[in-house]
């Protein structure tokens, strides 16, 4: 029994399970997976007893919005939601090769610290792509990951390599990522992303004139669709549906959905080719 061994003996015992040098992970190549499809407070929302928040339908349980692309050279994570660890464990995804951010709001960045483990698997800092305003928020919220003070041990803080992005397409993990400028209410700019004929556009209230052409000829559009009623910084269900019908992709999925948006009830009234997304939904990139 270990409980009866003296400390000198315990110090020389090694665990039977070796340290894993390669991650235990599912191959998601050629897929876009919606890790989270919920609004900033998630669904169920704390203290809410509405039929959706108390629903037993797992498609009504929505973690904070995030997604991951399985690209030719690895997994590209979109945003680090506060639920990131839970999301990756649920999907059995054990490694992130790069991260790209839509914007700087807390429900999209506060899982940043969960990137710590990936430096061990990659053997290098995790490449992170973001606009300057997002970098500023990361440096402020996670100052310990950026200061000059030596860490006590490897893995004590996230190890990342920042890359600034703005509007020009970029190459990440063997694919071209098209950046789509979007509006998130009167004060905030966000980025959507297009890879091939699939586009991911969350936290949207308006598509600027110059961005419509970037969203033509899509197979799949993932688009903000917060709730039935209008909102200052998000698309309502009617607004999102109108945009989808104008762009006419083969399939649209709404994300960043609030409670009271029952999965089955909303889908029953949406036009053909438009549905609510749900946590864990897999979309083909080909």
Give the predicted meaning of each segment:
Residues 4-6, 13-201, 267-285:
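Binuclear metal-dependent hydrolase catalytic cores
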Residues 205-286:
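Cap/insert and terminal regions of metallo-dependent hydrolase folds
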């Amino acid at each position: 029994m270990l409980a009866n061994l003296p400390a000198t003996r315990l110090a020389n015992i090694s665990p039977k399970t070796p340290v894993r040098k390669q991650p235990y992970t599912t191959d998601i190549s050629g897929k876009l997976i919606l890790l989270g499809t919920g609004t900033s407070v998630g669904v169920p929302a704390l203290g809410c007893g509405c039929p959706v928040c108390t629903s037993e339908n797992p498609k009504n349980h929505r973690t904070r919005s995030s997604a991951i692309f399985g690209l030719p050279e690895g997994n590209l994570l979109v945003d680090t939601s506060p639920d990131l660890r839970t999301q990756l464990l649920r999907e059995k995804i054990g490694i992130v090769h790069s991260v790209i951010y839509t914007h700087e709001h807390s429900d999209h960045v506060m899982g940043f610290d969960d990137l710590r483990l990936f430096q061990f698997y990659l053997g290098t800092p995790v490449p992170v792509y973001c606009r300057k305003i997002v970098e500023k928020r990361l440096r402020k919220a996670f100052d310990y990951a950026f200061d000059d003070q030596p860490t006590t041990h490897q893995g004590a803080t996230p190890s990342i390599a920042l890359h600034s992005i703005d509007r020009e397409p970029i190459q990440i993990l063997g694919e071209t990522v098209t950046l789509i400028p979007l509006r998130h209410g009167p004060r905030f700019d966000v980025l959507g992303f297009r890879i091939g004929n699939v586009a991911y556009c969350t936290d949207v209230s308006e598509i600027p004139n110059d961005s419509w052409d970037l969203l033509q000829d899509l197979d799949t559009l993932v688009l903000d669709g917060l709730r039935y009623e209008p909102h200052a910084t998000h698309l309502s269900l009617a607004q999102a549906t109108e945009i989808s019908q104008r762009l006419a992709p083969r399939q649209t999925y709404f994300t960043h959905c609030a409670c009271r948006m029952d999965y089955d009830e909303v889908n029953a009234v949406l036009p053909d080719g438009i549905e609510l997304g749900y946590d864990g939904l897999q979309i083909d990139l080909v």
